[in-house]
């Protein structure tokens, strides 16, 4: 195998409407089967409707939501002498953003399809507003991750 070192992170171009990289990352995560125009429509509509409810700019809303969902700690399994320990580690900034977006979209997709929240637009909008108010599936996932890391702090000396 050639040894050319680590691969540099890929540059993601900003989205066409707001010129923001974070919005583009959300669009890419919502996209299914390469249907980017559908994903753009879902994300833009959900952001605009959610922003209208809280009187904010859509990009500002997304940045606040992602900031609230970013995990600072997570656990990684580490094998030491035949036993596997869940060792808490600090999460790098890039991974924090990736996890926050992943949890947001995952929680929106898993929301029950009721009368008020039938389409993905409505579910994503509801999840954005819930995350802004520190509720919802994505926020619970972050809290659960932090709880796991805090509970396993006794193994933090295995970080190397």
UniProtKB/Swiss-Prot annotation:
GO CC annotations, alphabetized: cytosolic small ribosomal subunit; ribosome
Swiss-Prot/TrEMBL GO biological process terms: ribosomal small subunit assembly; translation
Keyword tags: Ribonucleoprotein, Ribosomal protein, RNA-binding, rRNA-binding, tRNA-binding
Taxonomic superkingdom: Bacteria
InterPro entries: Ribosomal_uS7, Ribosomal_uS7_bac/org-type, Ribosomal_uS7_CS, Ribosomal_uS7_dom, Ribosomal_uS7_dom_sf
Role played: One of the primary rRNA binding proteins, it binds directly to 16S rRNA where it nucleates assembly of the head domain of the 30S subunit. Is located at the subunit interface close to the decoding center, probably blocks exit of the E-site tRNA.
Record text on subunit structure and interactions: Part of the 30S ribosomal subunit. Contacts proteins S9 and S11.
PANTHER family assigned: RIBOSOMAL PROTEIN S7
NCBIfam families: rpsG_bact
Protein name, UniProt field: Small ribosomal subunit protein uS7A
Organism this protein belongs to: Aquifex aeolicus (strain VF5)
Phylogenetic lineage: Bacteria, Pseudomonadati, Aquificota, Aquificia, Aquificales
Gene from which this protein is expressed: rpsG1
